[in-house]
Amino acid sequence: MGVGVIHIRPPGTSSMVLYTAGSSTSYPSHAPNGIRLHFLGGAREVGNVGCIIEDRSGTKVLIAYGLAPTKPPKYPSEAPPVNHAIMTHAHIDHIGMAPWLTNHRTTLHGTELTAAVSEIMWADTYKVSDIEGYPLAWDKRDLEAALESWVPHQFNTWFNVGEWRCRLHPAGHIPGAAMIEIQTPEATILWSGDIDTRNSPNAPKATPVECDI
C-alpha cells in the first residue's frame, strides 16, 4: 500500500492522482496463462474497487473503478489500457474513477439505470472534491466524455467483450445494481458486486447463477 503520492495530470496526459493506492496487486507485464485477476483496489478492503480479469485469448475487462470517499480519498492503482469496463452499480466506490478511463477511450457497460445515475454521482464527486480541496484524476471534460462512453444493457441479455460473452443479472442492493456473468472459453465467472438476497420495492433480489468461479 503506497501513501503520500500525488501526481497531478498536466493537460494532454493521463497521470493518476494518488493519495493511496489502497489494497491492490500490481498489474504484471508478463502474466501467466489461465484466467487472471489483478486487483487495482478493493482487495481486503471496502471501497476504491477495481479488478482486471483477462485470459490467454488476450481478452480483458475492468470490473468497476471506484474511489473511497475518505479524508483524504483512497484511489485505486492506475488501470492499464482497456477497451471495456463493466460497472456493477452507481455507488461512488464502484464508479468514482470511471471518468478517468476516457484517457483509454474505454467503453463503459452497465444497466440503463446505472448509466443514468452516474451523471449525478460524478457531478457530486466533482463538487465535493472542490469543496474539500482534494484534487481528482479527472475533470469535467472527462465526466462529459464518460457519459458518452456508456453502452447500457438490459438484464439477462448477452453482449460480447472480445472473445467472451457477458450478461447482467439483478443484484438487489440498489436500483440498477447488477451481477456480471462472464463466459470465457475456459470457465464461467460470476462477479457478484454488492448484493442483497431480499426483494425490495425498488430492486429485485439477487438469485443464484451457475458458474465455475
What are these regions (language model features)?
Residues 2-7:
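Short, positively charged low-complexity motifs
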Residues 8-15:
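Short, Lys/Arg-enriched N-terminal segments with co-localized hydrophobic residues
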Residues 18-20:
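Short, basic/polar N-terminal leader/transit segment immediately after the initiator methionine
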Residues 22, 27-45, 50-86, 91-95, ...:
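His/Asp/Glu-rich metal-coordinating catalytic cores
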